[in-house]
Amino acid sequence: MKSDPELYDYLPYRNRPKITWPNGARVAFWVAPNIEFYELEPPGNPQRTPWGRPNPDVLAYSWRDYGNRAGFWRMMEAMERYGVRGSVSLNVAVCEHHPEVIAECVKRDWEFYSHGIYNTRYTYGMSEAQERALIEDAFATVQKHTGQRLAGWLSPALTNTERTLD
């Protein structure tokens, strides 16, 4: 891989044009909740272990499972209270494991982009064909469960490859 992938030109902060937001707003923010699913005993990957402790890591799994059982619902209620729409970074396994979560996002017209199938299955070491199949499967799963056609991809656990740097 090249030391600089040349995805964008260098532009120092002081040389950038001034950004103006609609209605004269001084601040803009984007709320992109990661709605993820971690397997208790994921398949191995020689490049990275999914858990910091031996498998099954019940402690780490339960911390992460809290998000779908309690954290998501609390976050959604707070966002709704303040009129904030989400852009969901989604492990698409949530569509099968917790369809109620997906239904609530759809009901609120949140936008989805794929964050892989499971957050414990990495793209490191995949061939281009394997990675393409993973992405196509994720996009098809989200469209089936939400009706949305995806335009974005964020590799699971940020395990980008040379093909998915941006």
Task: List PLM regions with ranges.
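Catalytic alpha-helical scaffold of carbohydrate-active enzymes acting on polysaccharides/glycoconjugates
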Residues: M1-G152, A157-D166
